[in-house]
Amino acid sequence: MKKVIFSGIQPSGQLTLGNYIGALKQFGQFQDEYECFYCIVDEHAITVPQDRLKLREQTRSLAALYLAVGLDPEKSTLFIQSEVAAHAQAAWILQCNVYIGELERMTQFKDKSAGKAGVSAGLLTYPPLMAADILLYQTDLVPVGEDQKQHIELTRDLAERFNKKHADIFTMPEVFIPKQGARVMSLQDPTKKMSKSDANLKNAIFLLDPPATIRKKIKSAVTDSSGIIEYNKEEKPGVSNLLTIYSVITGETIASIEEKYVGKGYGDFKTDLAELVVSELEPIQERYYAYLKSEELDTILDAGAEKAARVANKTLKKMENGVGLGRKRRK
C-alpha cells in the first residue's frame, strides 16, 4: 500500500518561485510513489478578511497552477477544502481537544495578530483545522517549509491525544522537507523568506511573471561586493540564495555551480540564472492559461472533491463514534 501525502496551499496572493521550489516542483514526482491529496485551503484563507470574488478567482487560478506544474488528476486528488464538509466538522472535534495555551503559543498566530485590535477567532483556531486537513486522509507525509513545522508538531500531539483519549484511528504524520530549496529567500532581503504576501514586489519572483520581469528581478537581486560566486549563507546570503535556486532548477550540486563560475562575475551568473528560471516557468504559464480557459478544470475539481469526501468521511465517522456524537451508524 502506498504511503499518503497531503499538502495544502492557501489561495491568497500569487504563488512565488519559493512556493514552486519548496513544494510544487516535487508534486509531480510524488504522485508515482505516493497516494497524493492536494488541497486548496480556502477555509484557511478566510481567517483574515477576503474579497469574495477575488477569493473565488484565486482558488480557481491556484487549481490551474497545480495542474500546470505537473499534477496528473488520474494519479493525484486535487480538490477545494470548502467543497469537502468533513474538514470543518473534523476541525471542530479537534478544536475541542486542543488547549488555548497551545494555540496562543503558535508563532504564526503571534506574528499575524501582533499589534492588531480585531483578530478573528479563526486565526487562533487555524491549527486544529490544519490538523483536520492532514488527519482525515490518514496522512503519512506532509511536505512543508520550515515555518510550518510547529503546526505539524501540534497535529501530531492532537492525533496522539485523540488516539489515547477516544479511539486509536489516526496515522501519525511526519514532516517531509526537501534537503535543498525548501526555503527560498527574498531577492532584496535574503535574511527573510520569499513571500507571496510581501508588499515589495521586487522581493519575489511570481510564477506568472513575464520573462522580462523575471530577468529584471534577478538582475537587481541583492548580492555583495566580493564578486565571488560561492555558497556562504552567513556572509553571502544573497548569492547563496541564488545558488540554491540554480541548484534546484538544474539538479546540479552547488559545488559544481561554484566551479563553473570561477573567474566569472555576478553579471554572468545572474544572466544565466534568469534564463534558467524563464525556461522553467514559461511552459508552466502556457499550461496554466490553457487550463484556466478549459471546462476540464471544473471537471477535475468536481471529481477530486468527490474522491476526497469518500476518504475523509470514513475518518470523520470514526471520530464521531470515538467522541460519542450522533447515533452509531454502520454506514
UniProtKB/Swiss-Prot annotation:
Gene Ontology biological-process entries: tryptophanyl-tRNA aminoacylation
Subcellular localization: Cytoplasm
InterPro entries, sorted: aa-tRNA-synth_I_CS (IPR001412), aa-tRNA-synth_Ic (IPR002305), Rossmann-like_a/b/a_fold (IPR014729), Trp-tRNA-ligase (IPR002306), Trp-tRNA-ligase_bac-type (IPR024109), Trp-tRNA_synthetase (IPR050203)
Pfam families linked: tRNA-synt_1b
Keyword ATP-binding: yes
EC number: 6.1.1.2
Chain positions of motif 'HIGH' region: 11-19
Record-listed L-tryptophan binding positions: D133
Reaction equations catalysed: tRNA(Trp) + L-tryptophan + ATP = L-tryptophyl-tRNA(Trp) + AMP + diphosphate + H(+)
SUPFAM superfamilies: Nucleotidylyl transferase
Gene Ontology MF terms: ATP binding; tryptophan-tRNA ligase activity
The entry's keywords: Aminoacyl-tRNA synthetase, ATP-binding, Cytoplasm, Ligase, Nucleotide-binding, Protein biosynthesis
Binding positions (ATP): Q10, P11, S12, G18, N19, G145, E146, D147, V184, K193, M194, S195, K196, S197
Subunit structure: Homodimer.
Role description: Catalyzes the attachment of tryptophan to tRNA(Trp).
Family label: Belongs to the class-I aminoacyl-tRNA synthetase family.
NCBIfam families, per database record: trpS
Protein name: Tryptophan--tRNA ligase
Originating species: Listeria monocytogenes serovar 1/2a (strain ATCC BAA-679 / EGD-e)
Gene name in the database record: trpS
